[in-house]
Amino acid sequence: MLQTFRNAWRIEELRKKILFTLLIVLLYRLGNAVPVPFVDTKALADYFQASGLQNTILGLFNVMSGGAFSQATIFALSIQPYINASIIIQLLCIAIPALERLQKEGGEEGKKKIASITRYSTVAIGLLQGFAYYMMMRNYSLINADFASNVWAAIVIILTFTSGSALIMWLGEQITEFGIGNGISIILFVSIVARFPNSIIRQVNNVVNGDLAWWVLVLMYLGALLLIVLIVLVNDAERRLPVQYSKRVVGRKMYGGQSTHLPMKVNMSGVLPIIFAQSIAALPATICAFVPKWQNSWIMTHVFDTTTWPYIVIYFLLIIFFSYFYSTIQFNPIEVANNLKKNGGFIPGFRAGKPTSEFIQKVLNKITLFGAIYLSVIAITPLIISACSKAEELTGISLGGTSIIIVVGVALETVRALEAQMLMRNYKGFLS
């Protein structure tokens, strides 16, 4: 492993990519420490602590923003507006034929237009979420008294939140283009990991104070370790369909005749279903939390609280839905079957064309179901334990199954991206 890092560092182009990625991450963390003007940050921190919001949907937002949400910094909204915009645009690409054609047939130009629409949507959603956050702070007297009713202060706060979310989106795009890995995923990874030390300290303090049994904490960390091993194994798992290429003569040379396989990953959509399911499941509870008279309403406490069974069921079904949704976007059986047919390939036992695509679709449905259930079970297990025991600490928002899946998944994706860069230069990678 150390030799691999040394090899990566020796490659000038790769070294520049790594340094650029680290620089963007540093800028992001610095932005997380810059407070928005006119906000009473101490009162806001006390409100989050006293209200127990660290174990609610807003606490989840706080984890995904690296603690910026509870401190009302310029990056408080984090990547939430971008995630929500991506969900909306990709759903519209299925519902609106013009957008679907643009996505599938537009080539690079079409992808650029879709990306541009997503950017504008991110800004619009950022404005809405910034306004909602401002209203929450105003309703709970978390804005400095001298500026509580000041229109100018409201405009500055909302625009600062919106600009911060747009800047995060831009930083993520820069990492994707000039750095290593997917920029948005890396920003999310950094945000979650940044909260781990605070979570560990809080849990150790709970043990010292007698609020949590030491053996429960040990079991939690052993479970987290086993979960990491399981995630690594499943992320590498794939179903390989045998493919045979028929022989063909071109001029005086004979081509084809070799056997290969078509790899289909079990967890094809990665961590995206969980990220998107969180955003959708959190939307109603977020609206309720931002309106004081709704915060203790029946729907908030009995349906959209993370420790209630209705929320767990909704969250489970959303992960299943987005797993299938993204598998259909990333892997098209008809397109794969047509490409095999054009190149003289076929799956033994199935005729080229429609029979092949139907078989691939059948296999895809099976492995997607397994991957979806795997993601769902890991994500909701801490919530089920909490719902049964009524111990909110066991929801493990910052060290729970959801966060571990995201962190390990992004880490593996980034390592593979770095390995691909190294293999292009004839060096052994991390996973070799």
What does each model-identified segment do?
Residues 1-432:
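N-terminal cationic and glycine-rich segments that engage phosphates or anionic surfaces
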